[in-house]
Amino acid sequence: MSQRSSQHIVGIHYAVGPKIGEGSFGVIFEGENILHSCQAQTGSKRDSSIIMANEPVAIKFEPRHSDAPQLRDEFRAYRILNGCVGIPHAYYFGQEGMHNILIIDLLGPSLEDLFEWCGRKFSVKTTCMVAKQMIDRVRAIHDHDLIYRDIKPDNFLISQYQRISPEGKVIKSCASSSNNDPNLIYMVDFGMAKQYRDPRTKQHIPYRERKSLSGTARYMSINTHFGREQSRRDDLESLGHVFFYFLRGSLPWQGLKAPNNKLKYEKIGMTKQKLNPDDLLLNNAIPYQFATYLKYARSLKFDEDPDYDYLISLMDDALRLNDLKDDGHYDWMDLNGGKGWNIKINRRANLHGYGNPNPRVNGNTARNNVNTNSKTRNTTPVATPKQQAQNSYNKDNSKSRISSNPQSFTKQQHVLKKIEPNSKYIPETHSNLQRPIKSQSQTYDSISHTQNSPFVPYSSSKANPKRSNNEHNLPNHYTNLANKNINYQSQRNYEQENDAYSDDENDTFCSKIYKYCCCCFCCC
């Protein structure tokens, strides 16, 4: 990143490099600390992790005036989870022009990437070792009074990343906080995280029903499908679905079709409910411990404390009974003749967990919401990353953002009315979609909590049913980037005109409206 102009410097001393992803929040770039060594920005207590000069980082850009800002709450989550193993460090949060930016550790490919590179199936050994790490990460999040609410392979990344030098050589390195373990699994993208209990009193949030959906349909729990308030049990059940996905290559509820999305996701939920976990074992080709895991997660009460050690012991039992050892050797280490994954040979790591769409596009523009017409694709060079992100925001702002003007909300109301009758999932009203304007500030320290933040501790004395309609703070939908146009207007037209929907149940819900986040158009 030599000869950088001042337009490419953010946060005083972070140089913005190439774009590496895009998602529901905006756009992400690779960056570099160019000034001096510094510590993670984690509140009043400085973190022990130090980012060295010339250390690579990931820089997220998000328009400041979005309807549902994500990066501020994501930074709050990183502050809460500061010091936990497998959680990236947040080095900076602030504002640059018309954008919020968040700077965190640069990480490697997601488990979804590695899963594809390994032929869309993990061995029992790799799945057990990965499962133990994933359970540990979720336990750490729960111990800090948060629930994740969007468990999926895309949001788990390994520590080792690879970069190509100007000379064309592959440079391998690990995140600054990984202790040089290239296969340490990280959790990222806390845009849907929420406090499930008061950090001081440990009082659990109350059980509620008729909640809007949030999460990824392929992996979400049965209770989430039926509109029940999520808690720790739902994160663990979603993990169980991910484990079977790794072992089987797919899940039985993938590929279901229905006349509309409401019926499709109800059908997915009913299929999950009807199938016994033992039916997922492929005639005992999969160790029974995975069925035991899923049964246990589904048997938990709403506010019950899970036994994480028991769940990890199930994975150890599966290894032992199959004469396998947890030796740290994963399937992806055998790629390319035992040399492991390589950024030049394998598809470039797409950093799912940072929020960008799965790049596996099969040409179905209606389903994937991606305009692949070469005549309309924008290939004009962009001067700076910030201008690129701003152009994306301006395009999407004029086409698909929810307007606060009731007169311009007619089409959105039409979409909501289409799925509302006799629905177990009650969409929010237009009045509940409006978020109060938050004061803008230059640094995080002056940002105060608002009622809409999922990180406001629950207080029983102020419990209000109306608040439950507004307690989610989920990603916005505005990522038309320079080289990929995502046309949400055509998606809405498709939903209204087409009588058969795709089988892409790996969609992430925004609980405010029945509309896709752009990070969810993943092929099945």
From Swiss-Prot:
Residues 352-414, 427-474 are annotated as: Disordered. It is found in: Cell membrane; Nucleus membrane; Vacuole membrane. Residues 374-413, 429-474 have a biased composition (Polar residues). One of its GO terms (biological process) is signal transduction. Its EC number is 2.7.11.1. The YXXZ (Tyr-Xaa-Xaa-Zaa, where Zaa is a hydrophobic residue) motif mediates the targeting to the lysosomal compartments. This is Casein kinase I homolog 3. It comes from Saccharomyces cerevisiae (strain ATCC 204508 / S288c) (Baker's yeast). The lineage of its organism: Eukaryota, Fungi, Dikarya, Ascomycota, Saccharomycotina.
